[in-house]
């Protein structure tokens, strides 16, 4: 869509230009948004013919962000023009696009053809638009659906950054207690260890388990921590984190569980990460009403620490050891597949990235 034959014109901002960044930051601040240029790839701004700022829109990957229109222009076509322009731009690159917004605003996107996937009242709604949808992910799940004789169908979602003996222990336990285990591997490539590497380390590490089916997480089995929160600046951080987890778990419950007939979801007891702790709480709150039992397994430990408390295995300890160049100190935490990879030249780039402080869990 172009802005020809309208009362508006649009410009793409230079995010390396402090003036341009200040322009959109000041505009959004008046509307209650805190603009962070590091969280977007492209930003456009719309003016009327008098040069007044009408609205703005940005994107990060396939996610629309910072879509906002000044109050006095909200009865115009400005919102529709911005969303349509940005969506058409993204659909030239991706097969579909997402937007996160407050539930009370979702109707405006629905009116432009977006479909609501899930809502976590009162903070989040997730909508999508494009040539593909969550139903395509369900079609993929149907291709890996296993034939089972019992209701012992379990699931687990892992990131494995990297794959540790803690992950292996949890997967082996689930496999020993169920007919089938669907192991979802988070696919978003924001971790220090890329998806392809994590997938291969897991595959090699559990090749002895014939009843575990590895599943690509796609764009729907993700980490809620990537969900934007720029429109929630006045909300309590813990509330935002909890609603991010709730939104993610609702997607799993509504779209994944019915396709695969999942009856259990295994999780490790969380002692370190507030995000994972929020996820575990959301699962315990939501999944039982969908017929899914949440089984929390005590995290595997290797001896005790200096204070005689259990020395739990965690991927973060492995990354910390890599950063400190003390990989030999954490060998007991690693299965053969991960250990062999980390001592190979193939891991050099990843180890360097961790030492430079890049990548997250």
Specify the residue positions occupied by each region the protein language model found.
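Conserved GNAT acetyl-CoA-binding A-motif
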Residues: 89-103
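Short coil/loop residues immediately preceding or within conserved phosphate-binding loops
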Residues: 41, 64, 151
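Nucleotidyltransferase catalytic core that binds NTPs
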Residues: 101, 105-114, 118-361
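Conserved acetyl-CoA-binding loop-helix of GNAT-fold acetyltransferases
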Residues: 75-88, 166-172
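Short, well-ordered alpha-helix to beta-strand connector turns
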Residues: 41-42, 94, 178, 262
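A short, internal acetyl-CoA/4′-phosphopantetheine-binding micro-motif in the GNAT/acyltransferase core
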Residues: 67-76
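Short amphipathic alpha-helix that is part of the acyltransferase structural core
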Residues: 1-35
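Conserved beta-strand in the GNAT
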Residues: 45, 51-68
């Amino acid at each position: 869509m172009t802005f020809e034959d309208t009362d508006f014109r649009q410009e793409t901002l230079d995010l390396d230009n402090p003036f341009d960044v200040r322009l959109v930051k000041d505009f959004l601040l008046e509307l209650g948004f805190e603009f962070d240029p590091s969280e977007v790839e492209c930003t456009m701004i719309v003016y009327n013919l008098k040069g007044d700022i009408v609205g703005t829109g940005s994107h990060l990957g396939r996610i629309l962000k910072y879509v906002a229109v000044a109050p006095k222009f909200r009865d115009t076509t400005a919102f529709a023009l911005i969303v349509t322009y940005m969506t058409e731009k993204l659909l030239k690159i991706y097969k579909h696009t997402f937007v996160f917004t407050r539930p009370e605003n979702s109707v405006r996107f629905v009116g432009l053809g977006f479909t609501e996937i899930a809502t976590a009242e009162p903070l989040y709604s997730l909508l999508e638009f494009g040539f593909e949808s969550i139903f395509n992910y369900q079609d993929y799940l149907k291709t890996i659906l296993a034939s089972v004789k019992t209701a012992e169908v379990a699931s687990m979602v892992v990131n494995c950054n990297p794959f540790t003996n803690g992950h292996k222990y949890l997967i082996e336990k689930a496999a020993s207690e169920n007919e089938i285990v669907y192991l979802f591997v988070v696919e978003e490539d924001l971790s220090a260890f890329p998806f392809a590497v994590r997938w291969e380390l897991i595959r090699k590490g559990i090749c002895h388990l014939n009843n575990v089916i590895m599943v690509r997480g796609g764009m729907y089995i993700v980490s809620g921590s990537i969900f934007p929160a720029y429109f929630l600046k006045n909300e309590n951080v813990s509330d935002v984190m909890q609603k991010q987890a709730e939104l993610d778990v609702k997607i799993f419950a509504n779209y994944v569980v019915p396709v695969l007939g999942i009856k259990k979801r295994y999780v490790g007891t969380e002692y370190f990460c507030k995000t994972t702790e929020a996820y575990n709480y959301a699962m315990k709150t939501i999944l039982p009403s969908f017929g899914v039992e949440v089984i929390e397994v005590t995290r595997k430990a290797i001896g005790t620490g200096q204070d005689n408390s259990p020395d739990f295995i965690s991927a973060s300890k492995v990354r910390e050891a890599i950063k400190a160049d003390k990989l030999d100190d954490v060998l007991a935490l690693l299965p053969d597949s991960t250990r062999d990879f980390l001592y190979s030249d193939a891991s050099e780039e990843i180890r360097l990235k961790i030492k430079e402080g890049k990548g997250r869990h």
